[in-house]
């Protein structure tokens, strides 16, 4: 098993990327790590070269670069070289903490879409604070600002596969993010998508879900268009972090009694903080392309990088991409019928 690593992508690259890879190497001795990066920056950081190979590159795609132009012009960048290694079969998966748009472009245009998937989407696992399971799949997080009803329908299929193969959730409960629970809510795209998903035999669709219910455990897969999904994700993350901050401030301002109570509650707050910590969860996955492609937060540190390697390992071992490819090929008539509903 080989993972191609964009060693130069991210706010703390290459130092935290290399540290994370070395942690992962010690955890997962069956993985070979291909580090793509600037030799003079990466080489001094590697303490032990076992199961690690450096492939020197001369360019870096910066966070502010225009994604498609950067992918096309910076052909010797760490990200593009890593993507091409996956395309050529020299690696099984691609990891980056760099420019999200450029990674999406590299995944779609270099590694390529699975035949039959119209729009690959960005998915992540978010915590559930109630219900049967600890996590749920949320997608699209912004790969596609606009979506057709058939795209949302396909996301239900992709998300269900990720839930079963990676999160271990069989017969995942799928819901559509909308501005109300009733069937007739939303714009025309969401109304059509609701009907397509309701009539589908490909997954277990339970109807709409509102953004306020995202963390309540009522779904194992929540499907959204990229604009709404990205906005809901950032609002949820921001609200959760602000609430924890406000609770901490309130405890510190209530005198000795409040501080004593806060000490008693500290383990509970740590558990909540851990569930909300992206360093624990791994990265966001580009579903619908021909290999696992995973993006961690730009500010991710070594532990987040290492945890993401475990996530990628599971995707490969569970045959996530081959199983999606087979299912899409076997159900092409059903997918075409969904497009014809537009």
Swiss-Prot record:
Keyword Cytoplasm: yes
Keyword hit for Acetylation: no
Family per similarity comment: Belongs to the PlsX family.
Free-text function comment from the UniProt entry: Catalyzes the reversible formation of acyl-phosphate (acyl-PO(4)) from acyl-[acyl-carrier-protein] (acyl-ACP). This enzyme utilizes acyl-ACP as fatty acyl donor, but not acyl-CoA.
Membrane-crossing residue ranges in chain numbering: none
Top enzyme class: transferase
EC code(s) of this entry: 2.3.1.274
Molecular function GO terms recorded: phosphate:acyl-[acyl carrier protein] acyltransferase activity
GO biological process: fatty acid biosynthetic process; phospholipid biosynthetic process
Keywords of the record: Cytoplasm, Lipid biosynthesis, Lipid metabolism, Phospholipid biosynthesis, Phospholipid metabolism, Transferase
Binding partners and assembly: Homodimer. Probably interacts with PlsY.
Swiss-Prot/TrEMBL catalytic activity: a fatty acyl-[ACP] + phosphate = an acyl phosphate + holo-[ACP]
Species name: Leuconostoc mesenteroides subsp. mesenteroides (strain ATCC 8293 / DSM 20343 / BCRC 11652 / CCM 1803 / JCM 6124 / NCDO 523 / NBRC 100496 / NCIMB 8023 / NCTC 12954 / NRRL B-1118 / 37Y)
PANTHER family for the chain: FATTY ACID/PHOSPHOLIPID SYNTHESIS PROTEIN PLSX (PTHR30100), PHOSPHATE ACYLTRANSFERASE (PTHR30100:SF1)
Pathway it works in: Lipid metabolism; phospholipid metabolism
Lineage of origin: Bacteria, Bacillati, Bacillota, Bacilli, Lactobacillales
Name of the protein in question: Phosphate acyltransferase
One cellular-component annotation, GO: cytoplasm
Localization, UniProt: Cytoplasm
Pfam hit, one: FA_synthesis
């Amino acid at each position: 098993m080989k993972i191609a690593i964009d060693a130069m992508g991210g706010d703390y690259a290459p130092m935290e990327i290399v540290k994370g890879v070395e942690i992962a190497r010690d955890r997962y001795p069956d993985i070979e790590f291909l580090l793509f990066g600037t030799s003079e920056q990466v080489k001094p950081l590697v303490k032990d070269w076992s199961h690690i190979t450096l492939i020197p590159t001369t360019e870096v795609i910066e966070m502010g670069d225009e994604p498609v132009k950067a992918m096309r012009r910076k052909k010797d960048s760490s990200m593009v070289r890593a993507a091409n290694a996956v395309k050529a079969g020299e690696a099984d998966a691609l990891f980056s903490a760099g420019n999200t748009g450029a990674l999406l472009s590299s995944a779609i245009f270099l590694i390529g879409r699975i035949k039959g998937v119209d729009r690959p989407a960005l998915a992540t696992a978010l915590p559930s604070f109630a219900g049967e399971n600890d996590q749920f799949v949320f997608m699209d997080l912004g790969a596609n600002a606009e979506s057709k009803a058939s795209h949302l329908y396909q996301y239900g299929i992709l998300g269900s596969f990720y839930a079963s193969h990676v999160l271990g959730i069989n017969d995942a409960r799928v819901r559509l993010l909308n501005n109300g629970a009733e069937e007739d809510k939303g714009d025309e795209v969401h109304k059509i998508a609701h009907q397509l998903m309701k009539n589908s035999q490909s997954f277990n669709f339970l109807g709409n879900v509102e953004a306020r219910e995202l963390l309540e455990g009522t779904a194992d897969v929540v499907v959204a268009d990229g604009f709404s999904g990205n906005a809901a994700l950032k609002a949820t993350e921001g609200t959760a972090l602000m609430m924890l901050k406000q609770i901490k401030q309130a405890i510190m301002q209530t005198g000795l009694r409040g501080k004593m109570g806060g000490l008693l509650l500290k383990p509970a707050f740590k558990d909540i903080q851990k569930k909300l910590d992206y360093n624990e969860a791994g990265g966001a996955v580009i579903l619908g392309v021909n290999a696992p492609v995973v993006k961690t937060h730009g500010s991710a540190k070594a532990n987040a990088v290492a945890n993401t390697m475990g996530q990628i390992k599971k995707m490969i071992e569970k045959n996530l991409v081959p199983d999606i490819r087979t299912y899409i090929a076997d159900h092409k008539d059903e997918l075409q019928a969904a497009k014809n509903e537009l």
